[in-house]
Structures are given as C-alpha cells and as structure tokens.
C-alpha cells in the first residue's frame, strides 16, 4: 500500500470507467459503471435532501458514501448480465465471493479496509433503501434516454422488469419515511416513474 495510494485510486476509477453496462444490449450512448455510480450518487443526495426538507432525517453523507461505492465490486466481476448471474445458485454464490474478494483487495491497496462495511451494506438500512431506489431509477433513466431521446427501441424490453423492481424499491423507501409529507412525495415519484415507463412502452410500435 505504501506509496501507491493515488495510483490505486486512479486504477479503480479507470477500470470502472472502462466497464460498460448492458453488455447484452446495443446502446446509442454506452454507459460505464463509473457513470452509473455517479448517477446513483447524485440522485441519492438530491432525494435525501428533498426528503429531509419534509422533516425526514436521512443521513445525506452516508447515502453519498454508499452510492459512490455500491458497484465497485464490478472491477473484479465485470457487469454480469442477470441471466448469467442468476442462472444457478452456485454461480451466484461464486460471483458474490469473487465480488467480496475484489472489494477487499481494492480497499486494502488503498488502506481503507473499514470501507468494506459501507460497500457490503450499501443497500441495507434506512439510507441504503434510498441507494437501492436510486440504483433502480438510474436504470429507468438510461432506458428512457435510449428510447425516448435517441429512438433506440432495442432497450424497451428492460421497461417491464424495471417497473416491477421499482415498485418494491419505492415501497421500501415509503416504509422508512417518518412523515406524511415524505410518504406522499415518494408516492408521487412512483406515479411519475410509471408515467415515464408508459411513455417508453408507447414507443414500441
């Protein structure tokens, strides 16, 4: 670790920026894992601040930390397509083990071993639910961008699974809200997200 902290950080950044998401789908504007993490972090901080304006008490700093590290394991595993990742329990377990080893190696090379717990619980707990929701919203954003802005109909098939996934993630955040205003706000976002998905599906023809 001595004398190589910056190069280790640079290496992690470069590798994440080189990893492309949606490897089984042709994109007009390809997205890297680093770009995705940045989107999730920005959305998480913005939603956290907005929710706190209604009297909620989400930890904005922790949301930023969790979201900024949540996919760093893909340096070791790559962006694995869901059909492959979940084809068998044994494959899923092997990939999970590889992810953990990769993250430990990365953080050890920088000397921030304590950050492992932040990554490992990135979508757990109250603040992690915000990260999980924004992870899903970042996918919706990409599908919307490709379909509605660039006319790429190839990615439309992602809309259905995204809608199902977001329903659960919105519900998870609603369950963590302590104020009526926060609950109503998240519910309004769910309605807005469904309208966006409808606009995506309308481009099928």
Task: Please give the residue ranges for each predicted region.
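Active-site flanking loop/helix segments enriched in acidic
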Residues: 12-36
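Alpha-helical phosphate/pyrophosphate-handling elements in metalloenzyme active cores
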Residues: 28-63
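Short, solvent-exposed segments of well-ordered alpha helices
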Residues: 4-7, 27-34, 121-128
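Membrane-helix exit/interface motif
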Residues: 48, 52, 75-83, 107-116
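Active-site alpha-helical segments that house and flank conserved acidic catalytic motifs
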Residues: 42-48, 60-80, 132, 136
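Histidine/acidic-rich helix-loop-helix segments that form or flank divalent-metal centers
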Residues: 64, 107-157
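Divalent-cation-assisted or electrostatically stabilized phosphate/pyrophosphate-binding catalytic cores
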Residues: 85-105, 152-174
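Active-site metal-coordination segments of metallo-dependent hydrolases
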Residues: 27-37, 88-97
């Amino acid at each position: 670790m001595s004398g190589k902290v910056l190069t280790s950080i640079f290496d992690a950044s470069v590798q994440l920026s080189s990893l492309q998401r949606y490897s089984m789908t042709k994109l007009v504007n390809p997205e890297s894992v680093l770009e995705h993490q940045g989107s999730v972090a920005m959305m998480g901080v913005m939603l956290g601040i907005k929710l706190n304006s209604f009297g909620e008490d989400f930890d904005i700093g922790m949301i930023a930390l969790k979201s900024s590290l949540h996919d760093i394991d893909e340096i070791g595993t790559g962006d694995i397509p869901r059909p492959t990742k979940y084809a068998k329990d044994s494959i899923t377990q092997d990939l999970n083990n590889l992810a953990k080893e990769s993250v430990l190696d990365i953080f050890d090379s920088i000397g921030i071993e304590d950050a492992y717990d932040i990554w490992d619980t990135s979508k757990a707990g109250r603040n992690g639910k915000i990260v999980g929701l924004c992870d899903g919203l970042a996918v919706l954003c990409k599908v919307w961008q490709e379909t509605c802005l660039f006319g790429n109909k190839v990615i439309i098939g992602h809309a259905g699974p995204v809608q199902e996934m977001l329903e659960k993630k919105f519900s998870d955040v609603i369950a963590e809200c302590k104020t009526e205003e926060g609950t109503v706000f998240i519910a309004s976002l769910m309605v807005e997200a469904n309208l966006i998905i409808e606009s995506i599906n309308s481009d099928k023809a």
